[in-house]
Amino acid sequence: MLVIAGLGNPGKNYENTRHNVGFMVIDQLAKEWNIELNQNKFNGLYGTGFVSGKKVLLVKPLTYMNLSGECLRPLMDYYDVDNEDLTVIYDDLDLPTGKIRLRTKGSAGGHNGIKSLIQHLGTSEFDRIRIGIGRPVNGMKVVDYVLGSFTKEEAPEIEEAVDKSVKACEASLSKPFLEVMNEFNAKV
């Protein structure tokens, strides 16, 4: 089974914020793959289905971003999923808005959701799709920026990044993630 987790914060107030771009990808995958996110266990909202002959579990942790590992570790234990079968999608301040970057491992890079995952999984070796949200300007605090909505200028770039992330997830069903990473990172 492949687990694809999108990081974000639960609740209407956070729905279209920069920090919730991981949730946006999961919602798009659920729609395209006809997987209903109808199970609410392990502090997460998730659903399972078969895509291209592979069993897939899509999940949105409902623990708030900084505690994402509290959802994923017990969920992965319950379904007996290894770390190499996990792909995590999340926002990244260090990438320009709308750019995506795939990685197979790495540090948290200051991202508290990833920090929580590394802590709970006991490793930094899991596949990631990072979606660029850019950095705040004019002295805006990072917390206000990541919890803010995309501007109308950013919206088309984010839609394109969500679409690319969906395509990367689809490609990873039939190819090794490293191959998908090389293909998609070359497009940046």
UniProtKB/Swiss-Prot annotation:
Disruption phenotype: Cells no longer grow vegetatively, but are able to sporulate. In depletion studies cells are more sensitive tetracycline; a depletion mutant with an rqcH deletion is hypersensitive to tetracycline, suggesting this enzyme functions in the RQC pathway. Pfam families: Pept_tRNA_hydro. GO terms for molecular function: peptidyl-tRNA hydrolase activity; tRNA binding. The record marks 91 as: Stabilizes the basic form of H active site to accept a proton. Gene3D superfamilies: Peptidyl-tRNA hydrolase (3.40.50.1470). The active site is at residue 19. TRNA binds at residues 14, 64, 66, 112. One of its GO terms (biological process) is rescue of stalled ribosome. Keywords: Cytoplasm, Hydrolase, RNA-binding, tRNA-binding. InterPro entries: Pept_tRNA_hydro, Pept_tRNA_hydro_CS, Pept_tRNA_hydro_sf. One of its GO terms (cellular component) is cytoplasm. Its main location: cytoplasm. Its EC number is 3.1.1.29. HAMAP family: Pept_tRNA_hydro_bact (MF_00083). Hydrolyzes ribosome-free peptidyl-tRNAs (with 1 or more amino acids incorporated), which drop off the ribosome during protein synthesis, or as a result of ribosome stalling. Catalyzes the release of premature peptidyl moieties from peptidyl-tRNA molecules trapped in stalled 50S ribosomal subunits, and thus maintains levels of free tRNAs and 50S ribosomes. Releases Ala-tailed nascent peptides from stalled 50S ribosomal subunits. Non-templated Ala tailing occurs as part of the ribosome quality control (RQC) pathway. In the absence of Ala tails significantly less peptide release occurs. Monomer. This is Peptidyl-tRNA hydrolase. It comes from Bacillus subtilis (strain 168). The lineage of its organism: Bacteria, Bacillati, Bacillota, Bacilli, Bacillales. The gene is pth.
